[in-house]
């Protein structure tokens, strides 16, 4: 199921999402003294990252990781790691602990997908709070509808938290949280922007439709997803 939150502009949506995520992190900190946040990459989250980085939280007890990552060097322009380091791990959030998916210092030829997944799994901590995005094809994290590993990514019986995925419609091999790992996250948020993505979301939210991976999140009985939307 999901709860819809709509805002007049992207700045308002980013600030409201930062408020909600900070509240969820504070709840985890109060309950167990620590919290783990997983975020998504791309250009859309930058305003949200900036707002969240200024929140008054006990950041030294917060771990920050990714919902998914491109298997590229962490200094590559397409690296989500680099994006988070630049826009989120700053201001007050600079004190947070980074939980890596891809090892620093590796060249592209040194980054073999299976080894990257093994490395990410060694560092993996189950998130308390997760912020997802959604592509125009309905993918979320790096669970792509036509990827050869799609079934593995959505099959919860194996209890696997991270998988290697190969997008057919996007560049770079990926490492991604699985549907099972997403469903085991206490607080799940989805940020979408623009009429085109809203149209995809509206289609994906109807019934059960594996053509849109986000549908599997929205209809998962273990997930209560808060959707933040602005044109």
Curated annotation (Swiss-Prot):
Keywords, comma-separated and alphabetical: Hydrolase
Gene Ontology biological-process annotations: carbohydrate metabolic process; pentose-phosphate shunt
Reaction catalyzed: 6-phospho-D-glucono-1,5-lactone + H2O = 6-phospho-D-gluconate + H(+)
A UniProt-annotated Pfam family: Glucosamine_iso
GO function terms (MF aspect): 6-phosphogluconolactonase activity
Enzyme class (EC, first level): hydrolase
Keyword Hydrolase attached: yes
EC id: 3.1.1.31
Pathway participation: Carbohydrate degradation; pentose phosphate pathway; D-ribulose 5-phosphate from D-glucose 6-phosphate (oxidative stage): step 2/3
Matching InterPro entries: 6-phosphogluconolactonase_DevB, Glc/Gal-6P_isomerase, NagB/RpiA_transferase-like, PGLS
Family, as annotated: Belongs to the glucosamine/galactosamine-6-phosphate isomerase family. 6-phosphogluconolactonase subfamily.
Free-text function comment from the UniProt entry: Hydrolysis of 6-phosphogluconolactone to 6-phosphogluconate.
Protein name: 6-phosphogluconolactonase
Gene coding for it: pgl
């Amino acid at each position: 199921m999901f709860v819809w939150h709509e805002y007049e502009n992207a700045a308002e949506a980013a600030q409201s999402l930062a408020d909600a995520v900070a509240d969820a992190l504070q709840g985890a900190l109060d309950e167990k003294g620590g919290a783990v946040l997983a975020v998504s990459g791309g250009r859309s989250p930058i305003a949200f990252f900036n707002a969240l980085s200024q929140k008054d939280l006990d950041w030294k007890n917060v771990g920050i990781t990714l919902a998914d990552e491109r298997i590229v060097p962490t200094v590559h322009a397409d690296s989500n790691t680099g994006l988070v380091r630049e826009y989120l791990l700053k201001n007050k959030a600079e004190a947070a602990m980074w939980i890596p998916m891809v090892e620093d210092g590796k060249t592209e030829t040194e980054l073999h997908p299976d080894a990257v997944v093994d490395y990410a799994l060694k560092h993996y901590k189950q998130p308390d709070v997760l912020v997802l995005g959604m592509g125009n094809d309905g993918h979320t994290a790096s669970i792509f509808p036509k990827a050869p590993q799609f079934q593995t990514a959505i099959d919860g019986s194996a209890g696997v938290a991270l998988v290697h995925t190969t997008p057919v419609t996007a560049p770079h091999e990926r490492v991604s949280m699985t549907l099972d790992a997403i469903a085991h996250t206490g607080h799940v948020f989805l940020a979408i922007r623009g009429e085109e993505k809203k149209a995809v979301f509206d289609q994906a939210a109807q019934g059960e439709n594996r053509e849109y991976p986000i549908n599997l999140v929205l209809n998962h009985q273990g997930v209560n997803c808060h959707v933040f939307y602005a044109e």
